[in-house]
Amino acid sequence: MPLPSMQDQFAALIAAPSVSCTQPSLDQSNRAVIDLLAGWLGDLGFSCDVQQVSPGKFNLLASFGSGPGGLVLAGHSDTVPYDDALWQTDPLKLTEVDGRWVGLGSCDMKGFFALIIDAVLPLLDQPFKQPLLILATCDEESSMSGARALAEAGRPLGRAAVIGEPTGLKP
């Protein structure tokens, strides 16, 4: 199946609910986001390992190439809870407003995954000396259970990492 355009990937990720919250009534599974990413990355030749962290909660570690070291492009697949009444647009629909794409998770941080898939596409037909790893964790917005599960699994990750979390350019 052909890879959707970056904008279509972005829209699909935004449309997939994945609220993480300590209040059970608001908490949602992130499986739909993980399935989208694993499908696209798998079609590109990545080896995809989906780790169930708890019921309905999953991490994805996708690797291209093999061996020690490498680069990890890391982010989380969940969003904060939202109130429809506080949005001027549908939070689960990618919408262009004043030349910017908006939607729940567009910046923090589902959009990161669409951007990195687009960025690495031209590199995938070249041999890699070390692996490229794409990591999507669950529950960063609430309990950090995805990151904890990854650490507890003890799987070595790359030598360097880029974390796509927005910072407001503050270290």
Describe each PLM feature range.
Residues 1-83:
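N-terminal helical capping/dimerization or prosegment-like subdomains
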